[in-house]
Amino acid sequence: MTTAAPHDIIRVRGARQNNLRGLDVDIPKRRITVFTGVSGSGKSSLVFGTIAAESQRLINETYSAFVQQFMASPARPDVESLEGLSATIVVDQERMGSNGRSTVGTATDAYTMLRILFSRIGDPHAGTSGAFSFNLPEGMCPRCEGTGRVSSIDLDALIDRSKSLEGGALDAIPNFVVGGWYWKGLAESGLYPADVPIAEFTAEQMDAFLHRPATRMAIAGMTMTYEGLLVKVTRLYLAKEAAQPHIRAFADRVATFAVCPECGGGRLTRAALGSRIAGRNIAECSAMQATDLAGWLRGMQAPSVAPIVETLLGTLDALVQVGLGYLSLDRESGTLSGGEAQRVKMVRHLGSSLTDVTYVFDEPTAGLHPHDVSRMIELLRRLRDKGNTVLVVEHKPEIIEIADHVIDLGPRAGARGGELQFEGTVAGLRASDTLTGRHLGHRVSLKESVRRRAGAVEIRGAATHNLRSIDVDVPLGVLTVVTGVAGSGKSSLLHGSLAGRPGVVVADQSPIRGSRRSNPATYSGVLDAIRAAFAKANGVKPALFSANSAGACPVCKGAGMIFTELGPAATVSSVCEECEGKRFTAEVLEYRLRGKNIHEVLSMPIVDAAEFFAAGAAHTVLARLVDVGLGYLTLGQPLNTLSGGERQRLKLAINMASSGSVYLLDEPMTGLHLADVDTLLGLLDRLVDSGNSVVVIEHHRAVMAHADWVIDVGPGAGHDGGTVVFEGTPAGLAGSGTLTGRALAEYVR
């Protein structure tokens, strides 16, 4: 790199965050810098944990102490010095939350512009823009409060009508067992008999039993509040998100949701839904996919609102450009994949007037078909050309090759990584002897011979979302890859028609439910074997080696951190001073297994733990975790810090023990380095050769070329997709002329 002025460089010295080993790098400003290296090599620790975290911390310090108490401020990263930082905007793959009130339209501000448009020229006039907001009292439907759905309870799942209250009619409800406090409030109310089957209640008794609102009355010799069963169950278990898994499972079992009869799912008042432009109301416009809504707006002849239309079109065109033209503005943000969520966040910034800021991206091509990667490249260049610094963590060669500067970390993951392997141009990286450099031109050959199928799973009339009554046979006993552009209907086909069938194991990238205490050791079950080994070696009970039980630090209760709630602000965490973050009591940490205590074992990378436990049940599980490419994770790493790809591979490892199953995987190559692709392909082969069937949704062309059978869905996205455009072998796909076929033909050697 040529010599540059100090203010043209982000200078990092002595970075030791996580596994970084005193890293020194110079990052040019107003350029695209791509960070490469195997998963766990330290890329995110440098870009997110050091540069972005310190930028955010310094910005937060500019606010008053009063304001700072309501902000989540990251701790200072472990680095000697950072110079030349600018304001940093992180565009990651973190999902956008599961709140149903957040939609693509609200997240991109497109719905705000649409509300202003309807408030100006909607006929009849319904009020200001607030009248068209389902998140404001003046606009939301009074029945569903702006959600578009009303909940009800499945009575048959809640109670056993053939039994009496004394006979256990309410046993399916948590905490309503016979003799319990909640049970007594109903059974001893005197409003209906407790010894008669519920099916024999009169209409009046049934109404009191189910629906009576909160009423003060004498029950069992004391004055207490009586509530009908549905009223009480709704208040206790359905009115708020439950924390305990068994309560969540109960709520999922008994709660049903239906379209609100008042607004028809439109979320708004009748007045707002009655206001129209060119025959459409705002809910109908929000339900159109972005490409169609943009076309409708371009046909609008209304000079008085031309600036609003132009701004809205800019946002819609940006959605199309990032490969999300198939989304509608009313699509709930929580239903987006990690890659989709990242691209929606990107749309917010494309029209920004800010310049000379640092944008940080985490694999922006995740979930993108090869056909759409060129659009992403253009967007990254646009951000750079506006005078911004663009930092990208990426594995795909197409993105690496557009870099102005490359920083390669490694050589391996975890404790074996964290070192600078290469810094310079793409040409220099290609000529280097680093792992990334050697694999940059990675290509595969089409499979010469494919496995013979052993039957098939028939899918008939699949019409979920944009699917057009698809009939397709998914072969068994082989590796099947389902391809197509983002939004073509791949996930709708498999998750809507294949998932849920007997014997189908789904390993996707969705978050793993659990507390902040959950980690790979607890989720995989290997902690039980580890605790048993410690207990046997020291002659004590296994519970001592659980941070959730007898061995937990009494101050932090085994969390290792002290969490302080700050009212409306984010929770602040600090390392527990009693156990110094080790989670266990000092007494427990004295017990050793082959020279190591339980904290040291849980701090091991999984690949080291597999060597430490060289045999037995623990080794079997740990070896599977290494096989799926997770050897760099530590056993005690919190699950909420894992990426979508890491979560998927963890689920896959847990389910690998069974045979005769159909494994359904959704983009398992996400987050994998080029050098790890062949390893995961070998794992998929082993699954098939062990008598399983593997069905993979994937954009990576190496996986397509390695398949036994390919199902290509398309031809486009949204209503331009939803059909099967090709079925056959990879060789047949490469010569088919479809978008996927052409991309595969360009890739194979």
Set out the residue ranges of the language-model regions:
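Conserved phosphate-binding elements of NTP-dependent enzyme cores
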Residues: 1-749
